[in-house]
Regions:
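Short, positively charged
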Residues: 1-26, 32-265
Length: 265
């Protein structure tokens, strides 16, 4: 612990009494903006993302963001299940376990979003989002690609939801952008969402050189492009969030969970 009088004085002058917003808040700072065209002052909430440390989280991992898949196409003995669940390399544990499942001739088929609240939030945004996210997670395993813009391209080629692509409509890109924007400004996985944006101003991004860039929600296209081209999937702790292990259900079917977490470069 150390004192920084000049910083404390500045924080007090801008009425900042906490270094970090609560995890349940999307807004880190509220700013009154003056629109020169309309002459109207509006108070806007902004989320602050810093590139000075590690990559910022856009959608936090939790048990609520687990997606459940059924293992189909092969039988597994209890010993084989235990053997696969014990695979624990220093890196790529999830990939190695999935590869072991595939070597038995089995495949992962999307079953459900584990958390009903998160499922409802996704369906409110777009009824196809649970299926799209499940395909993003599978395609990440298949290709090793984690950048969401590139994964969206892969889904557009594969078209797993069989959209009509005769007119080049960017279904996957648009829906993923909508998800990212909602997660950035208001929606949280484990909290029933009203559809309202909390951080209705946009993002303040602190660059590595200390400059601050504002991605204002008024310029929605630019804001959505920033999220889309900087977002990537990251694998969280398998033990903390209880995923990436084969589970034998009461009915004898086998399940395998994958976790959905998004960060920004």
């Amino acid at each position: 612990v150390f004192a920084a009088p000049s910083i404390e004085a500045f924080m007090n002058s801008v009425f900042c009494y906490s270094l970090k917003a609560r995890s349940t808040d999307k807004t880190d700072i509220r700013i009154v903006l003056h629109d020169q065209r309309t002459k109207i002052n509006s108070e806007m909430g902004f989320s602050i993302k810093s590139q000075l440390g590690g990559d910022s989280t856009l959608l936090n991992a939790s048990k609520a963001t687990n997606f459940n898949f059924k293992i189909v196409g092969a039988q597994f003995s209890d010993d084989e299940i235990s053997s696969i669940n014990s695979i624990n390399p220093s890196r790529n544990k999830v990939i190695e376990r999935v590869n072991a499942i595939k070597r038995k001739g089995a495949t992962l088929v999307f079953d459900k979003v584990d958390n009903q609240v998160f499922k409802n939030n996704l369906i409110m945004l777009d009824g196809d989002l649970p299926e799209i996210i499940a395909n993003l997670l599978i395609e990440q395993l298949n290709t090793g690609i984690s950048t969401l813009s590139l994964l969206a391209e892969e889904l557009s080629k594969l078209n797993p939801l069989n959209y009509d692509t005769n007119h080049s409509s960017p279904f996957y890109k648009y829906k993923i952008k909508h998800l990212l924007t909602s997660a950035a400004l208001g929606m949280m996985p484990a909290t029933a969402w009203s559809g309202k944006f909390d951080a209705n101003g946009g993002y303040l991004v602190v660059k590595k050189d200390g400059d601050v860039i504002c991605y204002h929600f008024y310029d929605r296209n630019r804001f959505e492009d920033y999220l889309f081209y900087n977002a990537y999937l990251e694998r969280s702790s398998t033990t903390r969030h209880e995923y990436a292990s084969i589970i034998k259900e009461v009915d004898g079917t086998l399940s395998f969970k994958l976790n959905f977490q998004v960060r920004l470069k």
